[in-house]
UniProtKB/Swiss-Prot annotation:
Catalytic activity: ATP + protein L-histidine = ADP + protein N-phospho-L-histidine
Xref: PROSITE patterns: HIS_KIN (PS50109)
Name the UniProt record assigns to this protein: Histidine protein kinase DivJ
GO CC annotation, single: plasma membrane
Histidine kinase domain mapped to chain residues: 335-553
Name of the gene: divJ
Length: 597
């Protein structure tokens, strides 16, 4: 089946640069150039006529020889200048017109023996096979004939040759001009044949490619009449059904109205797409994309998407199941964490009573057991609180309790709680706080938890004799808390995972020290405040974690620095941590920065 003309003309443009065998240039089919042969024949005929004139009784004198020379000159120049640019060809046509009309004038005008040479520019133009050149040659021929006629009527033209010479010259003019017109016709037919052969080759190549398509390409006219079908038909659709019943007839009854509307939309807007169930396979799903290529003419592609649709449904269901599972897990963790805290509070309370010996003295072993119970219960309570907070955040049930307070108080409170842990670990804990207030509008408990988690992590992974520094300062409405340690550092591979729930860095021994929720909670609390957490670390050179929160209400209030106060026991009134010079802002040129997303 041959493609429609509009479709062929559109698709043929895609094959202009195809190599053989789809294209066969005209040069391959061309043999001897008829135009070149005609010019050579013209010169040969002029030479023969000149030789014949020598043997006639009356050679005609100089006008005849001048006429033969004027006729030979354009052919000779055309053989020398073979360029095909427009300017050269136009000048050659003018030369043919001048030579032909001059020869006609010298042999008696339009009634003379060589009047046929007035048509020389038409014959020359016909060999160029260009409508523009043919019109130009006809105009020049008309001008030359008018000049020859006016010269004859005015009596300026020489007398026309008579006798055998007139016959020779007339025969020469008729034969050469006629051969030129015949050569032009031959050239036109040959070039047209080459073009037709090339177009036929391109159409065959297009049809071959279209037949090999994995989808079905169709040409649609009007409201669904299928005029061409190429490619592989999807299951449930046949070529014969499309051609005989039309595009709408190939769809299931319930989809035909939508398909008719899509065809109208493609005619109106230029393109349309839809999916439908075919009439011969309602369990299948077929996608149709249509585009307008000409008035009342569409091209479309039919492809089976049953497998893709099932896969999409499976993915959607898996996503729904995963979301439901995650929500259920978060609710379960939130409920279980709450239920676990209730008996744990009792355990902590009774262990405190035993430690305080409120009901009498205890032996050293029982006192040690009570201390272990209290420490283990405190550790378990911290883990439960972390799980509870993370589950609330994941379940979108965590609400910030914002208030206005001095951020230094929350930082100092967190550091006091961790002072015993730092002393036990043999790690120096420093605080670098400004002398003026850091008034913020934030959740006090969340801010304290941020400092607790960051400092606790730093203490866990800093060897004995190391140092952990906590810095807090404000600028441009932003509160920045920086916790820097001289610990083991974090590898680039682990940095990519940190900040996600239950993800930990380091080896198995280091991972056993926590749950992987500390940094996740810090990041979550920072994001709830509209801020961010940034980790900078280099393996073996320590870690710096910065939390930036846009919660600062006013610039720091300047105050006179006071000498650093010595740290006190956890049960004493809240003293300010030791204020020292801040550590270097960077760990070096090889620092790895990571902002969890």
């Amino acid at each position: 089946m041959i493609l429609p003309t509009a479709l062929k003309s559109r698709l043929a443009l895609e094959f202009e640069t195809l190599p053989d065998p789809f294209r066969r240039p005209a040069a391959r089919a061309a043999g001897l150039d008829p135009a070149h042969a005609w010019r050579l024949g013209w010169l040969a005929a002029v030479c023969l006529a000149a030789a014949a004139a020598l043997f006639t009784a009356d050679s005609g004198g100089w006008p005849v020889w001048a006429a033969l020379g004027a006729g030979a000159l354009p052919a000779l120049v055309s053989l020398i200048f073979t360029r095909e640019d427009e300017r050269t060809q136009s000048w050659l046509l003018v030369l043919w017109a001048v030579g032909g009309s001059l020869a006609a004038v010298l042999t008696g005008g339009v009634g003379g023996a060589m009047a046929a040479w007035c048509l020389a520019p038409v014959a020359a133009a016909s060999t160029q096979d260009q409508p523009k050149r043919l019109a130009e040659g006809a105009a020049l021929a008309l001008i030359g004939a008018c000049v020859a006629a006016l010269t004859q009527l005015s009596g300026l033209a020489p007398a026309a040759p008579t006798g055998p010479l007139a016959f020779v010259l007339g025969f020469l003019a008729l034969v050469t001009t006629g051969l030129g017109l015949a050569a032009g016709l031959l050239i036109g037919r040959r070039r047209q044949g080459a073009r037709d052969d090339r177009y036929a080759s391109e159409i065959i190549g297009l049809e071959t490619l279209l037949d090999g398509l994995p989808h079905l390409a169709i040409a649609v006219r009007g409201q669904g009449q299928v005029t061409a079908v190429r490619g592989a038909a999807p299951p449930g659709v046949t070529r014969a059904d499309l051609v005989n019943r039309g595009l709408t007839g190939a769809a299931a009854p319930g989809d035909r109205q939508r398909l008719t509307a899509a065809i109208a939309q493609a005619h109106r807007e230029g393109s349309a797409s839809l999916t439908f169930n075919p009439a011969l396979g309602v369990e299948r799903v077929v996608a149709l994309d249509m585009h307008r290529v000409a008035p009342n003419q569409l091209v479309g592609v039919l492809r089976d998407i049953t497998v893709e649709r099932h896969r999409e449904h499976a993915l959607d269901q898996a996503r729904i199941d995963a979301e439901a599972l995650a929500a259920g897990r978060a609710r379960f963790l939130a409920n279980m964490s709450h239920e676990l805290r209730t008996p744990l509070n009792a355990i902590m309370g009774f262990s405190d009573i035993m430690r305080a010996r409120m009901f009498g003295p205890l032996s050293d072993r029982y006192a040690e057991y009570a201390e272990l119970i209290h420490e283990s219960g405190g550790h378990l309570l911290d883990l439960i609180n972390d799980v509870l907070d993370m589950s609330k955040i994941e379940a979108e049930r965590f609400e910030l309790q914002r208030g206005v307070f001095d951020a230094r108080e929350a930082v100092q409170a967190a550091m006091r709680l961790l002072r015993v842990q730092s002393d036990t670990a043999g790690v120096q804990l420093r605080g670098v706080l400004p002398p003026g207030e850091l008034e913020v509008d934030a959740d006090r408990r969340a801010l304290k938890q941020i400092v607790l988690n960051l400092v606790s992590n730093a203490l866990k992974f800093t060897p004995r004799g190391g140092q952990v520094t906590v810095t807090a300062h404000g600028y441009d409405g932003v509160l920045e808390i920086v916790v820097a340690d001289t610990g083991v550092g974090i590898s680039p591979e682990d940095l990519e995972r940190l900040g996600r729930p239950y993800e930990q860095a380091g080896g198995a021994e280091q991972r056993a020290r926590g749950t992987g929720l500390g940094l996740s909670l810090v990041r979550a609390f920072a994001q709830l405040h509209g801020g961010e957490m940034v980790i900078e670390s280099r393996l073996g050179a320590g870690t710096t974690v910065s939390v930036r929160l846009p919660v600062l209400l006013a610039p720091m209030v300047a105050a006179t620095p006071t000498p650093p106060a010595a740290p006190e026991a956890p049960s004493a009134p809240e003293p300010a941590p030791t204020v020292e010079e801040p550590p270097p802002a960077s760990l070096g040129d090889n620092v790895i920065a990571f902002a969890p997303r």
